């Protein structure tokens, strides 16, 4: 029987979800969806001292915001300690693992000798075949009997064949600490095997864990999954992405007014491509994504590309979706009359959702203040008189075309040019010299509101 392709994302809730983690989750999600498989979410919360409930909540919220739906319930490792203990006991009973009674002082002494001899620090296996009486007062750790020679070889979906010499990297590593808690590599193997994970896509910072995990898969008699190790995301300076390159927490992007569609599109392209295409919907990606086409080299974070993609999605997504995202930021466009027209007014220039919010407020609400720099630059006695005449002549215009035709006729009669009038109108209506097409703003506000705002501006500035 052909097994169902199953991937997983397994973050540790010791901090908020980083965009590198979201990219890993996205790759796993897309590969599962393309193949009709399962995408699982596992929270690796065995570090009870460092775990944060807020971080766990933020991870799940980020998934919801991005529309990455996992299959089944979330698995929490902290609820599976009894299961891990069963498998530690199994390996002990089969002679594949053993208790090690080395004290902390003995370990430090061994490490100091190895460093003095310029040897790689490693456990020397002194309790590997121990059958004597255990020393008093020592709570033992449990170590796996790892191979001491030969090679560990696997075919990585991104990097190709990867080889590790056992003697160079391996010692009898710990699978259970002295307090009985299992170690990271041990829990990962147990869970991936029992959850039916067939394919593991993860950052290449996990590459060094892979030979240890393969040793455990073989010792436990589990099938080894297919591994794909993805190069890290770098900043534009070529260094590992960090806070100094900008936001790294996924939910910070939401607060910045970035759409999830734009962020996912941006992240998938950091390491994967499909021809020269730049824009992909999530539905497109479910059909096209192939982890075997992930680049081997690190990808470079490009803030301008994210901004460009965000502007694209603001221009093209339907009103309902844009407004749903705006509501998450505490702003509901639908409460305004002609809300769809207002969005269309604003979306052509907008780079973030905050541009929509600020633009809507500046148009819908009559200005309380006027940009002084804009006034000094664009307003003078002559065009104040022109503006007054313009307002007095407005009558029954309704569409942007009506306002444009009327304005052109008005300027021709006054022997003036659009540049003499456009910015004063813009400032009078919105308080700023920056706005969408002035004729569309006139249409949105209507003749009565336009006259009212121009009159108010003239009262304030005409003193």
UniProtKB/Swiss-Prot annotation:
Its EC number is 6.1.1.17. Gene3D superfamilies: 1.10.10.350, HUPs. InterPro entries: aa-tRNA-synth_I_cd-bd, aa-tRNA-synth_I_codon-bd_sub2, aa-tRNA-synth_I_CS, aa_tRNA-synth_I_cd-bd_sf, Glu-tRNA-ligase_bac/mito, Glu/Gln-tRNA-synth, Glu/Gln-tRNA-synth_Ib_cat-dom, GluQ/Sye. A motif ('HIGH' region) lies at residues 11-21. Keywords: Aminoacyl-tRNA synthetase, ATP-binding, Cytoplasm, Ligase, Nucleotide-binding, Protein biosynthesis. It is found in: Cytoplasm. ATP binds at residue 243. GO terms for molecular function: ATP binding; glutamate-tRNA ligase activity; tRNA binding; zinc ion binding. A motif ('KMSKS' region) lies at residues 240-244. It catalyses: tRNA(Glu) + L-glutamate + ATP = L-glutamyl-tRNA(Glu) + AMP + diphosphate. It holds the Pfam family Anticodon_2. The keyword Cytoplasm applies. One of its GO terms (cellular component) is cytosol. PANTHER family: GLUTAMATE--TRNA LIGASE, GLUTAMATE--TRNA LIGASE, MITOCHONDRIAL-RELATED. Monomer. Belongs to the class-I aminoacyl-tRNA synthetase family. Glutamate--tRNA ligase type 1 subfamily. Catalyzes the attachment of glutamate to tRNA(Glu) in a two-step reaction: glutamate is first activated by ATP to form Glu-AMP and then transferred to the acceptor end of tRNA(Glu). This is Glutamate--tRNA ligase 2. The lineage of its organism: Bacteria, Pseudomonadati, Campylobacterota, Epsilonproteobacteria, Campylobacterales.
């Amino acid at each position: 029987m052909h097994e169902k392709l199953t991937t997983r994302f397994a973050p540790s809730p010791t901090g908020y979800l980083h965009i590198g983690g979201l990219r890993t989750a996205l790759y796993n999600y897309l590969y599962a969806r393309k193949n009709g498989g399962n995408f699982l979410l596992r929270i690796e919360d065995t570090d009870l001292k460092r775990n944060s409930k807020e971080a766990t909540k933020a991870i799940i919220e980020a998934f919801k915001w991005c529309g990455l739906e996992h299959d089944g319930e979330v698995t929490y490792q902290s609820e599976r300690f009894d299961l891990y203990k069963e498998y530690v006991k199994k390996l002990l009973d089969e002679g594949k693992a053993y208790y090690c009674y080395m004290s902390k002082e003995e370990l430090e002494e061994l490490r100091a000798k190895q460093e003095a001899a310029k040897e790689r620090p490693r456990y020397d296996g002194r309790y590997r075949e121990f059958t004597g009486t255990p020393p008093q007062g020592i709570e033992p750790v449990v170590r796996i009997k790892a191979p001491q020679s030969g090679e560990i070889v696997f075919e990585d979906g991104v990097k190709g064949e990867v080889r590790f010499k056992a003697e160079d990297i391996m010692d009898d590593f710990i699978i259970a600490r002295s307090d009985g808690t299992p170690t990271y590599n041990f829990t990962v193997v147990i869970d991936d095997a029992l959850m039916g994970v067939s394919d593991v896509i993860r950052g290449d910072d996990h590459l060094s864990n892979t030979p240890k995990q393969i040793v455990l898969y073989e010792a436990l008699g589990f099938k080894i999954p297919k591994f794909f190790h993805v190069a890290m995301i770098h900043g534009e300076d070529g260094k590992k992405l960090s806070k100094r390159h900008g936001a790294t927490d996924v939910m910070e992007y939401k607060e910045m007014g970035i759409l999830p569609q734009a962020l996912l599109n941006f992240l998938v392209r950091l390491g994967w491509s499909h021809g020269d295409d730049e824009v992909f919907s999530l539905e497109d990606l479910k059909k096209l994504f192939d982890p075997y086409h992930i680049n081997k080299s690190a990808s470079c974070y490009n803030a301008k590309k994210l901004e460009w993609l965000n502007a694209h999605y603001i221009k093209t997504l339907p009103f309902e979706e844009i407004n749903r995202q705006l509501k998450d930021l505490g702003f509901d466009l639908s409460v305004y009359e002609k809300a769809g027209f207002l969005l269309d007014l604003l979306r052509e220039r907008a780079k973030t959702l905050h541009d929509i919010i600020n633009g809507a407020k500046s148009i819908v609400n009559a200005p309380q203040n006027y940009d002084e720099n804009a006034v000094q630059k664009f307003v003078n006695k002559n065009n104040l008189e022109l503006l007054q005449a313009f307002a007095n002549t407005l009558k029954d215009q309704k569409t942007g075309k009506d306002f444009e035709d009327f304005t052109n006729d008005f300027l021709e009669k006054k022997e003036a040019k659009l540049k003499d009038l456009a910015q004063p109108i813009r400032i009078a209506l919105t308080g700023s010299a920056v706005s969408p097409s002035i004729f569309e703003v006139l249409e949105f506000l209507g003749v009565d509101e336009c006259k009212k705002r121009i009159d108010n501006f003239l009262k304030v500035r005409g003193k």
